[in-house]
Amino acid sequence: MFFSTNELQHKDTLAIGLFQKSQLSGKAKEMDELLEGRITELLKEGDISSKRNQLSKFFPSPETGIKRIYFVGLGKESDYTFEEAKEGFAHLFRKLHQDKKQAVSVLLDTFIGKDLPAQDAAHTLSESCLLATYELQDFKHKTNEPDRFIEFVYAMTDHDTTEIQASLKVGEVYGQSVNSARTLVNMPPNMLTSSDLASYAAELAYKYEFEIEILDKEQMEELGMGGILAVNRGSTEPPKLIVLKYQGKEEWTDVIGLVGKGITYDTGGYSLKPRASMIGMKTDMGGSASVLGAMEIIGELRPEQNVIAVIASTDNMISADAMKPDDVIVSLSGKTIEVLNTDAEGRLVLADGVTYAKQHGASVLIDVATLTGGVIVALGNETTGVMTNNDELYAQFKEASEECGEMIWQLPITEKDKKRVRNSKMADLNNSPGRDGHAIMAGAFIGEFAENTPWVHLDIAGTATTEKPSCFGPTGATGVMVRSLATFVERFEGKK
């Protein structure tokens, strides 16, 4: 789909980036000369714009052999970064998709800035193309014409085409993997059960030669996974603990544990959600989708790291045998938990998932979950809440998230917070100390199972979905943290 070339391969549709500056330069200047100064004229007359994210279209004279040119405003070069480039490309490809263009030649060198080298621009191009042209998979009876997608993108450059092609490939892998996660999260809950999620993971394992283990209910009972089993009690769908192992080193050391919450539907259980809050709870497996998306990138790019991915999956339903407030359960770790809120179920399955990852060699842990409404109140829908017990590990993850443009913000876990989750007359822990500090209480609870293992907790409740369409696609799932997790794995520095 993406091709690097030193020559103009497709003249029907061209795309050129324009910085706000007094004079054109580089490839933009060369194209202006080919068009006998028309770009300069159009800029002066205001018919095309170099302001950031402004798109303009121009139809040259037939003798040039070029049918149409899309101009992408990039703003001031001094303000131009990876994120600005990503938005510019996204606006371009979304417009091309809407115009049903199937091929385009992009003058890549016009999108290069002093802080954005050619390889980064190429990565951004392919990643943004796939994110921007993603369409929600629906189940309507279609009678309209079939969708037409962009099939050929030629990145024309004076740089080494082999290096540019490699960067295009990495960006393509990142974009496709994010879209895979989006599709999982958008699926209706009757079409994505825990068994379906396990089947999807098995397909990944087969494709990328991961070691895979899928624990069923009987195996969980033998091991004593009281957290997952308690949440599953109200369901007719069997639970699954999905384990993928990728070994990129000779020895199984410095193992990164990725743990995803896989609640395929959440009614709240007997602590029942109101109707309005229940709609959309198919997305409560967003953490598992982020982990699987990251594993797709890992499988494609094969970093020299060791990774164990653990997904604890069930739905949270109601029946005569369902988990009740006041129940006391025994987790895989042996710690007992007093259930004060059956709608605080995600932390129960994560407790067993985290413990299982530790038991199977994880030396550091990152858990990902659509866990609390509290994090949305605190941070909104653009920033993922983060908690940790290890500043060095957090710093490594923060660097990865910044590189990917995914905003995070650290919330504290104090000794008083830990005391609140340990406050129970009946058990070692309680699963819901109260509404105040809700997001922190959830993180503190999971931290009781991470114990001394370096650990980062990502609460993506606010960022896993969006209600506003953007240049990066429609409403629905965002695939948040897929790129950050994969980048963290690639850059991870273990014990020194």
From Swiss-Prot:
Q: Which residues form the active site?
A: 273, 347
Pfam families per the record?
A: Peptidase_M17, Peptidase_M17_N
Alphabetical UniProt keywords:
Aminopeptidase, Cytoplasm, Hydrolase, Manganese, Metal-binding, Protease
Residue numbers binding Mn(2+) 1: 266, 343, 345
Q: Which GO terms describe its molecular function?
A: manganese ion binding; metalloaminopeptidase activity
Spell out the GO cellular component terms annotated for this protein, sorted alphabetically and separated by semicolons: cytoplasm
Compartments annotated for it: namely:
Cytoplasm
This one is known as Probable cytosol aminopeptidase
Give the classification, highest ranks. Answer: Bacteria, Bacillati, Bacillota, Bacilli, Bacillales
